[in-house]
Amino acid sequence: VGPDAGWGRWDATILRAADELYHDSFLSDATWMTLTKRYDTQQLIDVIFTGAEYIMLSMMANSFGVQPDARWAARLPTDVPRRIGAARATPLRLERARLEPIPVDEWSDEVRRLLDPNGTGRPALNLYMTLARHPTFYRPRAVQSAYIRTGSTLAGRVREILILRIGWLCGAEYEWAQHVRAGRREGLTDEEMQRIALGARAPGWDPFEAALVRAADELHRDDTITLATWDELAARYSEQELIDVVVTVAGYRMVSMALNSLGAQLEPDRERFPNIGSR
């Protein structure tokens, strides 16, 4: 039923955090402040990524049509309506970080091995320097991220279209700013990146790339890809590529939730969202 169904204050806060991550890709100030009264930095990061991880897994299970084992059928309540609140029309962007990046001169040896394994002495991105406050979490998360960015079966152009679209939908300006650069390296033009923000119906897409943008939209809105869009992608893509489409969108929705909720601030030389109106 949700956080207002007679829970104690703490349990209701945890449920509300899950709702806010799902609806808004963002933890409200009220929820964040309540969590900070009991949780340390690493636990706060774990709250965000636990909720985000299972949203990601739900998107994958729904899109692939994974059927529950027979013994699990009775676990999902069938007599409770699934109430989904409307997301904010304009996602919020925090003007200051909730968790600050670790300054370079405060890096421990462990953090230095994570963020600067080659000993360059240069600072890492603000997101990485923030997540490094939880080294135990950082290591496996970096492996997942590296797969999407460098090991995926998808062409770089396709990967960046999907990442930019989900970043735009989630209001994750930091994610957009980083991947505008990556998109240009993969051959995306400024006009095409503006078209990504406008969506699948924007003039100029070829049918297949429009289907990719639509897949990101459907995953964001419904946690699944419609059969029509799936069939359109499957006409060209292998099973591995179809999996990577969902993994890319779901993985970067997770990143968006963290960026927004932690208040990761843009580096000074990064581009902001294009000014094209509402999502």
Label every PLM stretch briefly.
Residues 1-279:
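Hydrophobic alpha-helical segments
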